[in-house]
Amino acid sequence: MSIRLEKPWQPMTQENINDLSGQLGVYELGDESEQVIYIGLADARSKFGLRGEMQQHLSSARYFRCEVNMAYSTRYQELLMVFQADKGRLPELNSDPGYLGRLSPLGNDSGQHDTELDKTPED
């Protein structure tokens, strides 16, 4: 199982936003090349859940993908850490939350990537 958000991109249109549920979860916003520019979450403070969050971003992104997830805070941090491990930085529209751990992708024989928390030399 991949820890990356691998759902298909959807065009950021009012029609697609209206089809979303009001549930909680995480999402990624993409530019015209479907490159991640922001990772966000719909948490307990979000009005109308994922639908409300996408409505706020209607004019700032071309594409989105989302995942309903009740462990949204942990999943959000996980997606940020994976992006940072892959690209060496956070998405351009995310600010540094200041509390992220680090992941190190490890290749295996299947060609998929696993992750492992970085260990200090004392470990």
Predicted features, each with a name:
Residues M1-I37, L41-D123:
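Boundary/linker segments flanking structured domains
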